Design a protein with these regions (language model features):
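Short strand-loop junctions, especially beta-strand C-caps/beta-turns
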Residues: 17-19, 51, 98-100, 152, ...
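Active-site/binding-pocket entry motifs
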Residues: 19-20, 91-93, 101, 125
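Beta-solenoid repeat scaffold
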Residues: 41-95, 112-120
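Acidic Asp/Glu-based divalent-cation binding sites
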Residues: 20-21, 43-44, 160
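Right-handed parallel beta-helix
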Residues: 56, 62-66, 70, 101-180
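Right-handed parallel beta-helix/beta-solenoid
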Residues: 6-35, 51-56, 89-91
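Bacterial N-terminal signal peptides
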Residues: 1-4
Length: 180
């Protein structure tokens, strides 16, 4: 009988100057969180290097009905083996969503549908609202369960800071939302 352990967990790295054609190591980081999610398994850590990740309209992860999701997290970890998306050491990653402005559609910067995920230590800025009426947009919307959203700063946008619905047993710890 072979049982997986924490020793089986891998580390992936994402950096503003990375490439999704690279291996995702500290020396050859990926460019996108979506590619890192594709490669990550329960128990893995995605280290996000400091700098500005400038989201472009052609990098939108998903458009569904009246929503555009810039970053869509649908893959889940497991109990005791969350997938971690953490800022690397004391570095400050910033996800600038200000250039994503599809007309007449709601924009969610981080759409979290998966469970057993842990996000820590980065900023989300510039999320837009592009139409009048019920034009709600969100910096981070969580539908999953057993997630930890920790030390995020969601600011200087037109969107709701954090919107949590449907899921259960989530922890929102030391997050800030302002100038939204």
């Amino acid at each position: 009988l072979c049982v997986g352990t924490a020793l089986d967990a891998k580390e992936l790295f994402v950096a503003p100057n990375g490439s999704d054609e690279q291996a995702g190591t500290i020396d050859k980081p990926l460019a996108s969180l979506m590619k890192a999610q594709d490669l990550a398994e329960p128990g893995d850590t995605v280290w996000i290097r400091g700098g500005t990740f400038k989201a472009k309209p052609d990098q939108v992860a998903r458009t569904q009905r009246i929503w555009t999701y810039i970053y869509y997290f649908g893959k889940s970890g497991k109990a005791g083996q969350p997938i971690r998306y953490w800022a690397y050491k004391d570095e400050k990653p910033v996800f600038d969503c200000s250039e994503v402005k599809p007309p007449n559609i709601r924009i969610n910067a981080f759409q979290v549908m998966g469970s057993w995920l842990h996000f820590r230590g980065f900023e989300v800025i510039g999320t837009q609202v592009n139409f009048k009426g019920h034009g709600q947009s969100c910096n981070l919307e969580n539908h999953g369960s057993h997630n930890i959203i920790e030390r995020l700063s969601l600011h200087d946008s037109q969107a709701i800071g954090i919107y949590a619905l449907n899921g259960s047993d989530n922890l929102f710890l030391n997050c800030d939302a302002y100038n939204n």
